[in-house]
Amino acid sequence: MSKEDAMSTGDSTESLDIDCLDDGDSEVVSSLQHLADDKLHISDNRDVAGVASKWTKHGCNSVEIDYIVDIDNNHEDPQLCATLAFDIYKHLRVAETKKRPSTDFVETIQKNIDTSMRAVLIDWLVEVTEEYRLVPETLYLTVNYIDRYLSSKVINRRKMQLLGVACLLIASKYEEICPPQVEELCYISDNTYTKDEVLKMEASVLKYLKFEMTAPTTKCFLRRFLRAAQVCHEAPVLHLEFLANYIAELSLLEYSLICYVPSLIAASSIFLAKFILKPTENPWNSTLSFYTQYKPSDLCNCAKGLHRLFLVGPGGNLRAVREKYSQHKYKFVAKKYSPPSIPAEFFEDPSSYKPD
């Protein structure tokens, strides 16, 4: 649901005086609720109470039985959408395959730009989003727009930064409460482009996107997957959260990782973050497998690619992401040590080494 839809729904809805309902009214409300559930086709798949799967923990002296924990049992917080969360993310998994860039647009479409130019642009955009304190979703959405546009439209080097500015403008209008003004974006680009040029490029991008600005990003999935990863902790584990976000943001710079869908990058980022924090423990479990819908073997190639990126960095003078997560407010996670390799047994599926 778009922000506009959410706002219009909230504006047009009046609160009910529940205290005034008599027994007859209660029956009417109950029947309406059943009717609404039927119309919405709310899935029963989210009910995981009592569902369990066996999982062998490597790196431990004893075999541990791991149960799936229901992360959608908090009905107190309306923002968690506990009743609909499972179906929402099921829909997003389908949607992410439809709003993806080409995986080889640099080789097949573009003639004047290469992967390093793309990385430099995104590194600069990381600095801009930090400078203007934009939400992370704006950055991810900006990169999504850039890559999708480059997948079809040929662009020259001079207009590469212009494309980035225009996509940032669109994404910030979609995500931010107070998006930066066009004049501000012209200023941060050292006035390389005029206001009219930015607006013209914005129109070109919107036309190409057919004004469909909603797109599932890695950040979208990361939020829910982190909830599943921290289900055994009363308070959020900030080191895990920041480290997973750092790894995910590094992936934005790496062109070779475009071949992986956002949900897979999000799941692999959590896998790698948990491994870095506790190298002797199996980072995956049945709760993560259930809510991400990925087995350890599914994560293997993506997690290894992210691990290489974590070890060597994006290269060149691309320091924005590393410097960002080297700050105290992010618990210095960019400075964390990681073992040089991930044990192969961590990528084995439960059935491959322990029968049901």
Curated annotation (Swiss-Prot):
Record-level Gene Ontology MF annotations: cyclin-dependent protein serine/threonine kinase regulator activity
Keywords for this protein: Cell cycle, Cell division, Cyclin
Biological process, per Gene Ontology: cell division; G1/S transition of mitotic cell cycle
Protein name, as recorded: Cyclin-A1-4
Presence of keyword Cell division: yes
Pfam families named among the record's database cross-references: Cyclin_C (PF02984), Cyclin_N (PF00134)
CC annotations in GO: cyclin-dependent protein kinase holoenzyme complex; cytoplasm; nucleus
Naturally occurring in which organism (per UniProt): Oryza sativa subsp. japonica (Rice)
Family from the record: Belongs to the cyclin family. Cyclin AB subfamily.
